[in-house]
Amino acid sequence: MSALVELDQVSAHFTVRGSGWFGGAKQVLRAVDAVSLAIGEGETLALVGESGSGKSTLGQMVAGLRAPTLGSLRFRGGPFATKAARRAIQLVFQDPFSALDPRMPVSSLIAEPLVIQGIGTQAERRTRAALLVEQVGLPRDSLNRYPHEFSGGQRQRIAIARALAPEPALIVADEPLSALDVSIQSQILNLLKSIQEERRLSYLFISHDLGVVNHLADRVAVLYLGKLVELAPRAELFARPSHPYTQALLDAVPRIGRARRRQVALSGEMPSPLAPPPGCVFHTRCPKAQAICRAEIPLLAPAPGRPDQLAACHFKE
């Protein structure tokens, strides 16, 4: 599988001012810290982790909304900050209620990315909007209506149609199901899968719902405190997670027919990204932590006997 987007030691750091009457010393918040991975053509790569792990910030960098502080991104082996890359990468936001301008009809909302990028004539844009609204399962008369006239699931369909308008190669989907009712989530999930099959799209799918990830992803990247701690094919990761943090995330999800093994329970809160722990960033919550974990940063390396499953742990399984 050829790489569509490559991230090489990408970091996102923010400078924040301390508290107090006169402001404290400036501190560096490491939202994403030296992450390297690739998204393949036609692949769904899922990003998972707790709130504050850096998932959305990483997604913003891939979508071109935020430049990395350190490191670099490449698009199909070439420069990332190009018009071709901007057109090829689109974003679907978490909240369909706030992602769509309430003053614009659906036809204009879907066509807006084409206007911004100078694609097609006005007539061609109208034609594409009409085709897309039907492809996402809405009637053609939706084109003249406004966002407030639709349900949450229908608005997310409109947002998906809008993202598809420039014919992208990659869609960054940031928690696209979390604001929807459970009954609607499966419909949108099936829509995303069918669109991918028809168009050979790639997805960077950001989610906290491991059940959804298990149905959609080809590979899974696990983030903790801005660090990539595990990267593996979906089936291997769900069957035999290597990193203790991944084990804990999976153990928190009830599953029928789960293989019997000692469960890993998370204790305590995630440390502040303003003051990450030395060594392995997970050692403050890890039941396997030893002296080496507090002193040395583990490298992302293959798990024993599984070359495609990478984990950053001194005691990976």
Task: List the model feature ranges, each with a label.
Residues 71-81, 85:
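Conserved ABC transporter NBD signature motif
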Residues 3, 16-23, 28, 231-317:
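Short catalytic/signature loops enriched in Gly
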Residues 146-150, 154:
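Conserved ABC ATPase signature
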Residues 63:
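Helix-to-loop junction immediately C-terminal to a conserved catalytic motif
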Residues 124-141, 194, 250-251:
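Conserved ABC ATPase "signature" region
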Residues 172, 176-261:
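P-loop NTP-binding/switch modules centered on Walker-like glycine-rich loops
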